[in-house]
């Protein structure tokens, strides 16, 4: 079997990480696959290692803008798949524009399907883009030969919007890079911490409208006001309007620039070092499909104060302390509860560390290609019966 992978709309972030990891972890010969063809931009394909069975293709349209990529998906993908004798196309970006069948797609972005979250962007190009993505992905999920979801939550939310699916679907969560795995540290009483040795709180995430960093700043400010020797470390790139809101919050609550440390983006290959310096992790997003950063925080052996929205309770289970990310007072109580109780911190960090072990790129790669193989076989059998 020859599998084609449409990576034309994968530019950065989790989508690229996913395709890099499944290709580096799959044993294609376990799935009756002889060759994999992948189409993507030069930048995307440069991040993927070379393998004897992998052919990388970059049509000139994929190095251009969104419109050019969509035109290629509609017309160029079909011809290239036929020319390469593909038996199936895997489109992990969620869009299905060409008429080639069978084709399997994937749900990786929840923002287009959660209107309340999308409205945070007001009248903007991002809102228009989310509307376009919602239309494209809804159409893609309905017309595909199979769909992969990352969580039960994501599947339920998408089905609420587009209705029940009549095609095969499955749930295959992403994996986790083992370099993030760090046995939970010994937890100390809060009396151990002081201004010279402060309690380090870490929140890794892009600064964006649905990530709520400003509420975390306000919550930690209340802890500081009560005498807790805490420092808040914020790590990640930023969306400019959200960054402005964050800076306003920092200027309001940390006037002397003493305890909020915004580090900006940190290279992915160095990120695990950041987790090692923290004493507690916070995750305050209100919109996720499968929160990779939450998995990284769990694997890093940190006690976690976590948003109660989206799939977070499904992923973290009873291994964290939850809060409403839009209510700073709830964030304050969740963090305070963990700081005040070293035994609770120890129990939660151990529980989350063991829970995250089920997220494996080996398993993700095996289950993904098994599903692709199953869809291809079913499609072939249905053609033979006609």
Role assignments for model-derived ranges:
Residues 286:
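Aromatic "clamp/platform" in nucleotide-sugar-dependent glycosyltransferases that forms part
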Residues 55, 246-269:
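Nucleotide-activated donor-binding/catalytic signature segment of Leloir-type glycosyltransferases, i.e.
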Residues 16-24, 199, 208-222, 329:
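A conserved mid-protein helix/loop that constitutes part of the nucleotide-sugar donor-binding site
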Residues 38-43, 176, 231-247:
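Glycosyltransferase donor-sugar binding loop
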